[in-house]
Amino acid sequence: MCYNVGKNLNEVYVNMSTGNGVFDPIKLDGSWDIQILEPPELICNSLEEIAGSVTLTDNWLKINVPGSWETQGISPYFEGIGVYKKYFDITDQYYSLLKEGNIYLRFYGVSAWAEVILNGVNIGHHEGIWSPFEFNITDLIKKEENELIVKVIKPGKKFLPLRESLAGFLPDVCMPFGGIWKPVEIVIKKDISIEDIRIKSDIHKNELNLSLYINRDNDEKSLIEIILYDGEDVLLKKAEEIYLNSGTSNVQFKLKIDNPHLWSIDDPYLYRLEIKVYSGSELSDRLVKKVGLREVRYSGSNILINDSPVYIRGILHWGWYPDTVAPIPTEEVIREEISKLKEAGFNLIKHCLYVPIEEYFDIADEMGMLIWEELPLWVPKIDDKIKEKVYKQYNEIVKSIRHHCSIIIWTLGCELDETADYQFLNNLYNMVKGLTDGLIRDNSGSGECYGGLLNENADFYDYHFYTDPPFYKDLLDSFAAQWRKEKPWLFGEFCDSDTIRDIKRLIEVYGELPWWIFPKGFGINWNISYHRQIEKIESNNLSDKLPYLVKSSIDKSLVYRKLVLELARQYKNISGYVITGMRDTPIATSGIFNDFGELKYEPYLIRTINSDTAVTIQWDNRRRWINGGDRLIRWDRFNYQSGSIIRPHIVISHFGKDHIKNARILWTLEDGKDIIDEGEEYIECNLSPGMVNEIATLEINTPEVSDITKLTFRVKIYDTDLEEVIAENFWAFWLYPKISINKYKEFSVCLIDHCNIFQDVKDSIFSKFNLTSDISNCEVIITTTLNQELIGCIGEGKRVLYIQQGGGYIPVERKPFWRESIQIMEKHPIIRGFDNEKFCSQQWYSLATDTVFTSEGLDRLAGNNGKWYPILRRLDARNFDLDEYLVEVVLGKGLIIASTLRFQGGLGDEANGISLNPAGEYLLFQILKSLLKIS
C-alpha cells in the first residue's frame, strides 16, 4: 500500500502508467549498497516497528538492482532486514523540468515489504511482491547527492509469515526471495497524467473501447488525442477536448475500426495505440501500448476466441529460474520457452501463483501464447488482515497487467479450503470481474475437492487430478458428468510425471550440488531427497545405470502423459488442460524441460496428442452376465493373444480452423520397421471446430507369433478437401504366443487362493495345467497367503509363487506405479519379452499395482540362511527408495517367486480377471515354467 508525501497517511493506490510519458525516466538500476541486519529480540506490533528497530553500521556490501539478494552472496535463509542505499544526482536538464510537474520515485517490484526513506524523510511503505508502486517526492528531491534508503523484509517465518502474505507457491518450490527484484526509476508527471487504462474489444461492432483514468491538478478542459497505428501507418486518429475535474477522471472512448485485423494464437497481430493528453497547447503525458483486438467468451463447454473454439493445451509455470530465484528471465529465455512450447503444440502458459514480469506478457502478446494468470493466494491463513491485503494487492496486480490480450483466464487462488468463505471469494470474484475480461474463477482446483465452497464463483470447472492412468476414467466419468451445468471444464493442473534427475550432470554444471536442491524448511516439507540422490543410488549399486534411468524415466513419462491426454481428449465437455509442469524444480522433476532448459521429449511426439486436432482410439464396451445381472467388463486394450482381431474406434477431437467434411483414414500395422498390414478408409466426417466424435471402427487381424511381439499401429487423418494430413498418432500393442492345451497337463499345480483374486480359473492359464488342492502332491504351489506351514514346505524343497497385493506375510508399502517412479528390470528368464522396452510401458497396464515389498521385509523373509534376488523393482524418482514388485527368494532347498503385481488386473480400468489380461496371464505362465523348470 502506497503512502505519499503531502497526503494524510491513509493507504492510497496509484497504478502508474507504464508508457513512455513525456520525459525519459532516470534509471536507478545498477550498483547499490546493502546492509544485512537482524532486528533485536523484542516484541513488535508492526513491520514498521521491526524496520525501525535496527541500527545502521558502516559495514556496507555491494548489490545489484534489479535482482534477488539470494543470488548475490546473501544467505537464502536470511530473514532479517535488508537495508538498501543509493546516492544519485539529478542532471541540470532534468532538474530544470521539475517546475513543470511532479517527480515520482517508482518501484516496479520489491519482495515483499519496503519502507522508503529519501534524504532522511520516511516517505512511506508498501507491501506486495508482485505489483508496482510509487511515491511523490517533488518536495524532497535535490539536485545533487540524494540519499535513497529502502528497508526490505521478505516473506518467511519470522516477521512476514508466508501464509499471511501473498508470496504464492515459490516459497514451497524453493524459498521466498527477497530484495528489490525489479527496476527502480524516477519519473516526472506534469499537471495532467494518464494513471490507468482499460482496453476492451468488441469484435462484433468492430470497436476498441478505451477507459482512461486521467489525473489533473485543477478543473479545466484538456485535449485528448488518440492515434491507432497499423504497422507504421496511422489507421485512425481521434482528438477530443474534455472537461476534467481535479483529481482522477474516467474518460471513455470508442474507436471504430473498419475490417479489423484480429489477434489470435496463429496470427497474433498487434496494433500500436498512442494516447496524448495536453495542458493547453503543451503535451502533458503520453501513453503507448501494443494492443490486440480479440474477444474471449464461452458457449456451452467451448472456450471461444473471436467466436472460434479453442482447446486449451497449457503448461504449468511456477516461475522457477534457478539462476535468478526471482522470476526475472531474460527476453531470450522467455522467447525460447514460448518457441519450444509452441513447437510441442502448447497454446497456453498458466503462471501459477505468481505474476511474471511485464516482458513475459509483452512477448506472449507478440508470439500468440495464451496466458492463464493465477493470482498468488495459496494455503492462506484467512482472517480480516489477509483479506484486506488480498483486495488491495489484487487490485494493483490486475490493473497493472489487464491490458495484455494474451491473458484470457484468471484464477484468484489455488486449492482453497473451507476457511476461504463465500463472501470473501464472492467479493473478490466480482472485483476482478469488474476490472478485466476473460474467464474468471475464484478457486483453481475447486472447493468441491478441498472441503471448500460448493457455491463457487466460476466461469468454468477446474480440477487438479494427479493419479495413475487406470483411475482417470472413473474420475472423469464422475467429475465431468453430463448432468452438470454446461460450461468449460479445464484441468487447472494435472498429469505430472516425474523423471530421474541427471544429478551428475547437474554437479558438472554447478561444480557441486546447487544450494537450492537441499531441503529449505520455509514452506511445505516435501518427501524428497534429491540432495541424497547420488548417495542412495550408489548404495543400491545403481550409479552406473544413471544414464539408463534418466532415459527410461523420460520414455515412461511420455507414455504416461500420452495415455492420460488421449483419454481427456475423448470427453466432449472437457475444454482443455494444463500439464504440470514447465521445468524441473527443487521439489519435483515433472517438468517437460529438464534442469538445463532442454525439452525432454521430441516435439513431434508431444504434438501427436497435443495439437488443435488430435486422433485417439477407443474400444468396444463389453458386458457379462454375473450373479443374475449385467456387469461392465474391462479388458486389457494393449495386449492380445496372437491371431486376435483388434478393433480400435477412431475418435477425433477437432479444434482446428476448418470444417472437416471428407477424410481418409490411412493406417499401418508395423513389426519394427516392417509394415505387416495397412489400409485406408474414406469417410464423411462432417466435423465442425469444437467437436469430438467417433469417425470409424477398424478391424485389424494380427499375425500368429511364437514369441512376445510388439506391434505399432499408426493412423493418419487426411482431409481430402484441404489435401493435407490434419492429425496423426501411433499406439503400441503386444502379441503373445498361444499356449498349448495339452502340453502342460502332466504338471500339477496347487492353487491356494484365499484372497479370491483368480475368479476365472476355468477360462485362464490354469486350465492348461493339472490343477489340484493337494499341497503334498504337487510340483508348484500358487498361493495368495503365506504361513509357517508353507515356509516349512519351501525349506524342504517346494517351489512356490506367492502373490501378495495388500497386507500379508511380507511387509509392504503403498506407492503409485506410474507416477513418481521408474521400474528397473533385472535379467531373469521369467520377464523375457517384457523387458525389451527397458521400462514399464502400456504392456504392464493391467499388471500395474500400488503395492511394493520393502527390502527390510524381504530380508526378514530370507533370514540368515536364505537369499533374495530382485527381478522387477521400483525406484522412487523423488526420494530414491528402492522397493520390489517381483523377487526370487531361495529358502533352504526350495524357492519362492513373490510378487505384488496384479496378474488379474482390477485397479481402476485395468482388466477384470486374468483371462482378460493377456500380459498377466503370459507372465504367470512364464513364472510357472520357471518354477517347473520347463524350458
Regions found by a protein language model. Give the residues of each.
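Active-site-adjacent substrate/metal-binding segments within catalytic domains
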Residues: P66-I90, L97-F107, S111-L118, G124-E127, ...
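Short alpha-beta junction capping motif
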Residues: S776-P816, K893
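Beta-strand-rich binding/interaction modules
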Residues: L118, E207-I242, V251, L273, ...
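Substrate-binding/catalytic cleft of secreted carbohydrate-active enzymes
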Residues: I338-S339, L348-G597, I781
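Extended acidic/polar, glycine-enriched regions
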Residues: K142-E145, Y213-R297, V705-I739
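Accessory beta-strand-rich segments of carbohydrate-active enzymes
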Residues: T18-G19, I26, G30-P39, I74-S75, ...
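Accessory carbohydrate-binding/adhesion or oligomerization-edge regions at the termini
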Residues: M1-Q72, K151, P155-K158, G231, ...
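Catalytic beta-strand/loop cores that center a nucleophilic Ser/Cys/Thr
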Residues: G808-V812, W818-Q926
